[in-house]
Amino acid sequence: MASTTVAGQNSDVRIEVISQPEDFTQVTEVVRDAFGHQARDGVYLSMNPGWDTPEGVVRGAGRMANRFTTVSKNNKGEPNAVFLKATVPDPENAGQRRIVGMAIWAQQSAIEGHGDQPPKDLIKELGLESIFPGNEAEQRYAAACMGSLHKRREEVIAEKATAAEPAVFVLDMCAVDPKFQGKGIAKKLVQWGLDEAKRRGGLELLLEASSMGRHVYSKLGFKQEGPEIEYDVEEQFAHRDRPSNIFMRTGDGQ
């Protein structure tokens, strides 16, 4: 029987800030297995052509590593994006650890110096021209999906521009290897963000929740705001599958 903490969670799980780009191959495999093989998330599948091939993993890891190496800092010197990994002892390699969960937390704000500003050109910011070279329709579709997904997030960021604390802390992505789900790993990744937001001055936390993740988020104090997120896409793409997502937030002063 694995050792557990008093809370009943597996004590072999470690949550650590990623410090080397080499980790992103395993991180990308976790995302692939959770969003691709398990959830069949339509937006993930469309934005990651070849996601289930070795080449697709290399491309995905490269994009994540590029974001990692270009992280900006706020006016307090804190990174505006933090990449987390959850590791457990590798069952196939004694003495080594294996990445089985990941999260990206981002500080965002409409005010310079208080966090990354929401992107003005999604095709450029997401590198969609390199993902879909010469295919403007697919570039527009991916941008429309992400723009719709983050619409309420960006409205809240704009609303906070005149607040005493104009920044928010956003869960940009969270995934756990399907073989290691149900062990409290997602909860630990989210709790790290709650603690970090408090350390950064009590920032409000925002996220877009899939059907799989929302029960974890609600237990940790996130509340749904508004109805299901609607995707505003061109008619030619209306038939495509897109995942259920809702906008959730903690409220001010967390």
Model-derived features: positions:
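Conserved GNAT acetyl-CoA-binding A-motif
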Residues: F169, A197-A209
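Conserved acetyl-CoA-binding loop-helix of GNAT-fold acetyltransferases
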Residues: V176, G182-D195, K219
